[in-house]
Amino acid sequence: KPAEFRIGMIGSQHAGEASYCDFFPQWHHVSSGEQAVLLAADIRHAYFDRERAGDYDRLSQQLPQPVAQFLDVFRASETYATLSSEYAYIQDYRRSWARAPYPPTFVTVDSVVIHSGHILLVRRRSHPGKGLWALPGGFVDQDERIRDAAIRELREETRLKVPAPVLAGSIRSSRVFDHPHRSLRGRTITHAFLFELAPTGEGLPKVKGTDDADKAKWVPLFEFQRMEDQLFEDHFYVVNWFLGQV
């Protein structure tokens, strides 16, 4: 029986950017060009910016009724409150760099620490990613080398009771993750290191979340694979890249 209707995607794609429409290759894509009447970006910004509630109320009148109703219900949820707070933080963070002579590029480090089939994760204490699990890591100081920064941040955030020389000798691999849009904060290039700690017969080393982390814990790797929606930024994919090298 022939279909009584056809499904398609109508939208525009900005140069150099991935398109949402690309996620649905089974649907025919009709490029409409940029429409000045109603832009999804305008709706998103007004929806999450509490200071622009009036703008959202105006824009929402142009949405299909079921979509507007769904967004109104979602706006009363705890998840929306979290996202709105995160949005405000990101906007403030970007404004703080607005007067820089050039767009900033941030250099960070992350540590993938494996021990006896477990991975070491921390829970982020504050924005961005407040409450999400992440790899131990942070910004590189002006006067330190990349590897030293990774070891320092690892020990600061987890209180891992492993001497720095032992950690340095446990590095098995490293890689730079530099996708231009991997972080909402702005251009952030991270140097990630894989640490493989040898079993000692004393079980997993004790850890405790400190500094930017309110909790640190060892997570079984099989459990980690079910945590994609709980991980900060691209950390889930960073870990899985290294696991493919083990």
Predicted regions and their residues:
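Unchanged
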Residues: 139-243
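Short, flexible loop segments at boundaries between secondary-structure elements
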Residues: 27-52
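Segments forming glycine/polar-rich beta-alpha architectures that bind adenosine-containing cofactors
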Residues: 121-124
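Acidic, metal-coordinating catalytic segment for phosphate/diphosphate chemistry
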Residues: 67-110
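N-terminal Rossmann-like or analogous alpha/beta NTP/dinucleotide-binding catalytic cores
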Residues: 1-28, 36
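A polyampholytic, Gly/Pro-enriched intrinsically disordered region
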Residues: 46-66
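A conserved beta-turn-beta hairpin within the catalytic core of GNAT-like acetyltransferases
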Residues: 127-131
